[in-house]
Amino acid sequence: MAELTTIARPYAKAAFDVAVEHNAVDTWAEMLTFAALVSENETMQPLLTGSLASTKLAALFISVCGEQINEQGQNLIKVMAENGRLKVLPAVSELFAQYRNEWAKEVEADVVSAAELSSEQQQQISNSLEKRLARKVKLNCSTDAALIAGVIIKAGDLVIDGSVRGKLSRLSEKLQS
């Protein structure tokens, strides 16, 4: 995964710079998401790792994407095909989304709770994170009964484990040391 990120980073950065320059960040995000889905398609996978000439592969990929990819997006596809990097499109899309969130002063936070959170509880968590991170927060909520009670919040590099399972685990570690 780290290797894919390293390979994808320059493509994502270049795409993001072009998107900002042309005031088309959302358009680029949609294009890259679509292109990533195409590259992950089980029919397309063998072609990406096969011996098809890069120009033919790029033309095929662009024809499959159709009108979902504009001329600048097509140029990115061509460059990535020439370098044999179309298989990293999902990582490019993911990195682009991270750059977009950073640029827009937004962050996605994954909140895992033992029981479903009410909209009021979600709003309280969102408000607290917005104050702490100085960013607009978008919550992705899920449940996991194995937490016993409480929540685990992951937002960027920040991890807050307020679950009973986490507290029991930390207590167990202290008792064993």
From Swiss-Prot:
Gene3D superfamilies: N-terminal domain of the delta subunit of the F1F0-ATP synthase. It is a peripheral membrane protein. GO terms for cellular component: plasma membrane; proton-transporting ATP synthase complex. Its main location: membrane. It holds the Pfam family OSCP. GO terms for molecular function: proton-transporting ATP synthase activity, rotational mechanism. Keywords: ATP synthesis, Cell inner membrane, Cell membrane, CF(1), Hydrogen ion transport, Ion transport, Membrane, Transport. It is found in: Cell inner membrane. F-type ATPases have 2 components, F(1) - the catalytic core - and F(0) - the membrane proton channel. F(1) has five subunits: alpha(3), beta(3), gamma(1), delta(1), epsilon(1). F(0) has three main subunits: a(1), b(2) and c(10-14). The alpha and beta chains form an alternating ring which encloses part of the gamma chain. F(1) is attached to F(0) by a central stalk formed by the gamma and epsilon chains, while a peripheral stalk is formed by the delta and b chains. Belongs to the ATPase delta chain family. F(1)F(0) ATP synthase produces ATP from ADP in the presence of a proton or sodium gradient. F-type ATPases consist of two structural domains, F(1) containing the extramembraneous catalytic core and F(0) containing the membrane proton channel, linked together by a central stalk and a peripheral stalk. During catalysis, ATP synthesis in the catalytic domain of F(1) is coupled via a rotary mechanism of the central stalk subunits to proton translocation. HAMAP family: ATP_synth_delta_bact (MF_01416). NCBIfam families: ATP_synt_delta (TIGR01145), PRK05758.2-2 (NF004402), PRK05758.2-5 (NF004404). This is ATP synthase subunit delta. The lineage of its organism: Bacteria, Pseudomonadati, Pseudomonadota, Gammaproteobacteria, Alteromonadales. The gene is atpH.
